[in-house]
């Protein structure tokens, strides 16, 4: 299960070493840990990391197909987690050592900054290829966090971006060797840890006001699983 570690002023949220898919228990655990960091005394920053070949593969579609009655609450929780991170008064960095797909890629986009592995690992929004349209809130998140041409290409083609391509496309700020992903993300986060939480939160919540409103609109954020 996800857990917190600490490196000086930087909290490291470890997602796990599996596919890190979003079922209710997983999302609740991650949300609780993010809130724990938000409540911690300043200065502090957050890095979200994982181990293995996958950072996160997003929604747990198998779990959802077996718990149809729980899909709506799960989606509400996922959108709330995105909103929590997007408007957080804490600097956030995603340390992406492996694949970030679908909802996992969106989780990365909810962070302020992304550092990727250079030689392996894809950033991909494959919804167009698995016949699951983005929710209103997801669309708002993606288009508010990516350059317009990149958002259009990523959402409508399902392109897989490697680390260097992600940097060129404005998805990530750096692509480094595997063993440097987490240390580099921690260094980037540590340099920002002294930002005033109230000021940072006000800036982010005003900057992304329309996206946060879209993420909170449950009626517009349902999906239908492919049959």
Residue ranges and their predicted role:
Residues 1-49:
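Conserved CoA-thioester-binding segment of acyl-CoA-metabolizing enzymes
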Residues 1-18, 154-194, 202-214, 219-227:
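Amphipathic alpha-helical segments at domain termini/boundaries
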Residues 3, 42, 49-81:
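Glycine- (often His-adjacent) and acidic-residue-rich active-site loop
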Residues 13, 29-30, 48, 60, ...:
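Terminal peptide-recognition signature
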Residues 27, 61, 78, 139, ...:
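A general structural signal for well-ordered alpha-helical segments in protein cores
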Residues 33-36, 77-89:
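Catalytic-core regions built around general acid/base machinery
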Residues 52-56, 101-102, 207-210:
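Short, active-site-adjacent cap segments at secondary-structure transitions
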Residues 84-196:
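Crotonase-fold acyl-CoA enzyme core
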């Amino acid at each position: 299960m996800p857990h917190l570690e600490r490196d000086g002023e930087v909290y490291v949220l470890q997602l796990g070493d599996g596919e890190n898919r979003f079922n209710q228990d997983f999302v609740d655990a991650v949300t609780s840990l993010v809130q724990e960091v938000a409540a911690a005394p300043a200065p502090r920053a957050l890095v979200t990391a994982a181990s293995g070949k996958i950072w996160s593969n997003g929604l747990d579609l198998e779990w959802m197909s077996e718990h149809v009655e729980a899909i709506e609450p799960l989606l509400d929780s996922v959108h709330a987690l995105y909103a929590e991170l997007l408007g957080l008064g804490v600097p956030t960095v995603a340390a992406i050592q492996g694949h970030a797909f679908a909802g996992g890629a969106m989780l990365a986009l909810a962070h302020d900054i992304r550092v990727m592995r250079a030689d392996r690992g894809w950033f991909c929004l494959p919804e167009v290829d698995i016949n699951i349209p983005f929710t209103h809130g997801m669309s708002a998140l993606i288009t508010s966090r990516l350059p317009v041409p990149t958002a259009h290409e990523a959402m409508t083609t399902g392109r897989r971006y490697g680390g260097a391509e992600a940097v060129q496309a404005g998805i990530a700020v750096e692509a480094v060797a595997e063993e440097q992903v987490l240390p580099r993300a921690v260094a980037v986060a540590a340099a920002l840890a002294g930002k005033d939480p109230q000021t940072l939160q006000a800036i982010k919540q005003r900057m992304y006001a329309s996206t946060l409103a879209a993420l909170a609109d449950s009626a517009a954020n349902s999906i239908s699983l492919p049959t």
